[in-house]
UniProtKB/Swiss-Prot annotation:
Protein name: ATP synthase subunit delta
Key words of the record: ATP synthesis, Cell inner membrane, Cell membrane, CF(1), Hydrogen ion transport, Ion transport, Membrane, Transport
Bilayer disposition of the protein: Peripheral membrane protein
Residue pairs linked by disulfide bridges in the UniProt entry: none
Top-level taxon of origin: Bacteria
InterPro entries to which the protein is assigned, alphabetical: ATP_synth_OSCP/delta_N_sf, ATPase_OSCP/dsu
UniProt GO cellular component terms: plasma membrane; proton-transporting ATP synthase complex
MF terms in GO: proton-transporting ATP synthase activity, rotational mechanism
Length: 178
């Protein structure tokens, strides 16, 4: 995974710098998201791995599948990635691009998993507290997992806050073992 990120980083950085310079961050994020989804398709992966096809043929097929969703610069990006055999890295490129975009916008995606559904008021309060703690705008994504028994698990980038009953029971069990 780290190797893929290392290979994807220059492409994500170049795409981000281009999109930022032309004030097209949202468009490029959408285009790279589509490209990532297309590259993850099983049929497309077989085509991209086919040794008998040239990089130009792979790029043309890729662009054909995406239709008119790509502007000229995005098509050029696909050609460059194909020439360097990096089309299969598009999911990592897209993820890194979105990370750079979030950093630039001073925002962070936060995944909140709770034992029970959070109402809008609870989500708003949680987002406000997390925003103050993280110093960034928070985009909250809530989900439910009954196996937590109670409480919440919050994930924001590398930060994980486990306030679930299941997590506390696991810590207690670990303490009793030692």
């Amino acid at each position: 995974m780290a190797e893929l990120t290392t290979l994807a980083r220059p492409y994500a950085k170049a795409a981000f710098e281009h999109a930022q310079a032309h004030q097209q961050l949202a468009n490029w994020s959408a285009m790279l998201g589509l490209a990532a989804a297309v590259s993850e398709d099983g049929t497309m992966q077989r085509l991209l791995k086919a040794p008998q096809l040239t990089s130009a043929e792979k790029a043309a097929a890729f662009i054909e599948v995406c239709g008119d969703k790509f502007d000229a610069q995005a098509q050029n990006f696909i050609h460059v990635a194909a020439e360097n055999d990096r089309l299969l890295l598009l999911p990592e490129i897209s993820a890194l691009f979105d990370l750079y975009k979030a950093e630039q916008e001073k925002s962070v995606d936060v995944e909140v998993t709770s034992a029970f559904a959070l109402n809008q008021e609870q989500q708003d309060k949680l987002a406000k507290v997390l925003s103050a703690r993280l110093g960034q705008e928070v985009r909250l994504h809530a989900s439910e997992d009954a196996s937590l028994i109670g409480g919440v698990v919050i994930r924001a980038g590398d930060l994980v806050i486990d306030g679930s009953v299941r997590g506390k029971i696991a810590k207690l069990a670990e303490a009793l073992k030692s």
